[in-house]
């Protein structure tokens, strides 16, 4: 995951960062460390003009299952040339990935405390078709922030 921060970063006595700005790559159901930066930094930029990189959190998340870690990957359409800006990456409708991802999440977390409380908020991401990966990822981040009661300043 590509991340960078600007100068003028302050630390609290317990070591937490009180910073000014962070630059993050887009992420599909981002890891906790990614979400933590939304809370720590005063301003967060999510890069939409960087070139898409395969095998990154841009279209992949990792969940914990009874059998270990499982990666869930959003399929993307092929693009012309060697590079394509993240903002132009289209989600492929090939296969039943939405159904498979939702079933994997339900299987892994369905018996967890509070899953029923959050399931109705998360299910729509697997029922609706999305055109662009960046937009899909940002809608997920917005919903996660709402559920976690985090109000980041994201651009």
Regions found by a protein language model. Name each.
Residues 2-155:
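Residues lining hydrophobic/aromatic ligand-binding pockets adjacent to catalytic sites
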């Amino acid at each position: 995951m590509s991340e960078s921060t600007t100068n003028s970063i302050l630390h609290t006595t317990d070591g937490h960062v009180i910073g000014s700005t962070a630059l993050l790559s887009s992420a599909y159901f981002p890891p906790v460390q990614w979400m933590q930066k939304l809370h720590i930094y005063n301003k967060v930029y999510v890069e939409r003009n960087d070139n898409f990189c395969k095998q990154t959190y841009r279209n992949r998340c990792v969940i914990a299952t009874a059998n270990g870690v499982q990666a869930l990957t959003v399929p993307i359409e092929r693009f012309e040339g060697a590079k394509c800006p993240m903002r132009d990456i289209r989600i492929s409708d090939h296969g039943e990935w939405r159904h498979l991802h939702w079933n994997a999440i339900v299987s892994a977390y369905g018996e967890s405390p509070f899953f029923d409380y959050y399931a109705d908020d998360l299910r729509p991401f697997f029922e609706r078709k999305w055109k662009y990966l960046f937009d899909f990822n940002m809608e997920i981040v917005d919903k996660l922030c709402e559920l976690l009661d985090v109000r980041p300043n994201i651009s």
